[in-house]
A protein has these predicted regions:
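Interfacial loop-to-transmembrane junctions
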Residues: 83-106
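Core segments of transmembrane alpha-helices
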Residues: 43-54, 104-111
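Short juxtamembrane and helix-loop transition motifs at transmembrane-helix boundaries
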Residues: 6-8, 27-38, 67, 88-93
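Juxtamembrane boundary at the C-terminal end of a transmembrane helix
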Residues: 113-119
Length: 119
């Protein structure tokens, strides 16, 4: 289970990094839009991500299981730390697109390397 969680975290980094690298303007717009969502609503959505991710992970195997655990991990961030996530997104909105792309490339590189090494 630890390996699946590690691979899910690597997949999460790779996906989120790819989104920011290839579509930085869209990512900034979505992060700015998230500032208007109440913390409680973000927490409930996070808990739904956790529940759905764990149900799918229990029913599947292989890469789908890893992807489902990645959804549950993202739900954990939004479900239990909504204020922190909004604060991080607010900081990302304030930075330039080139800086955002650097952070995205870093996340994509770490995630892709971990997936290549450990899957």
């Amino acid at each position: 289970m630890i390996q699946i969680t590690f691979l899910a975290f690597a997949l999460f980094l790779a996906i989120e990094g790819a989104i920011v690298v290839f579509w930085p303007a869209w990512a900034k717009k979505k992060m700015a839009d998230m500032q208007g969502v109440p913390d409680r609503a973000l927490g409930v959505i996070g808990l739904l991500f956790i529940a759905s991710g764990l149900v799918v992970a229990g029913l599947t195997d292989g890469i789908i299981k890893i992807a489902a655990v990645a959804v549950a991990l993202e739900g954990t961030l939004y479900g239990f730390l909504p204020t922190l996530m909004k604060r991080l997104m607010a900081a990302a909105v304030q930075c330039s697109e080139s800086m955002l792309k650097v952070w995205g490339e870093t996340a994509l590189g770490i995630g892709a390397a971990a997936l290549a090494l450990f899957y």
